[in-house]
Amino acid sequence: MNDETQLTDAGRLEKEEIEDLGTVTLARGEHVIHCLTVIGQIEGHSEAPQGQKTTKYEHVIPQLVAAQENPRIEGLLVLLNTVGGDVEAGLALAELIASVSKPSATLVLGGGHSIGIPLAVSARRSFIVPTATMTVHPVRHSGVILGVPQTMRSFEQMQQRITGFVAAHSGMTEKRYTDLMLHTGELVMDMGTVLDGRRAVKEKLIDELGGLSDALAWLYKEIERK
């Protein structure tokens, strides 16, 4: 197999990864970075309705394991534009990203709403573009529930898991996150707060205002420092 054939095969494999999984391993720059996209709705134990763009957690988990175990991959970049989705699936992915030992960065583009917030803060460094937004609101549930105190306690425990994770991986306190989550003066017929990029940084939810070049520059610096 000659060099030209190898390049063609590598290009075809890269194209398939982007089309099928929304991922690519960037190997033509200074360092080898694995790029993972989280878009649309985060799909967990149940399939999303037809026509919705989704990120399937059963596709993402093996990619994160591979990024951790592959010695060629030096860093991880997670690009986010998500409306949220399954709470347990989102938290599972956030915990996995947080446990990757290699330099990692997240970049919020467009939106990082709901359970997308733990994902946005899960890496070593988080970035957000000025026009992106993040909606902080309480846990929701669709479908029939039992109207008993135990159900309410279950919701409270689930919310505490999210709040605790966000506080542990960002500069925002649990109290401030809860205050923003329960705010009633902003969303119509709902509670919560919408943060744009600058306010997300000001509130210490996100580390830095910036774009792709800023996130890659930080990753390169961390890789070289190691």
Regions inferred by a protein language model and the residue ranges of each:
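N-terminal organellar transit peptides
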Residues: M1-I117, V121-H137, H141-K226
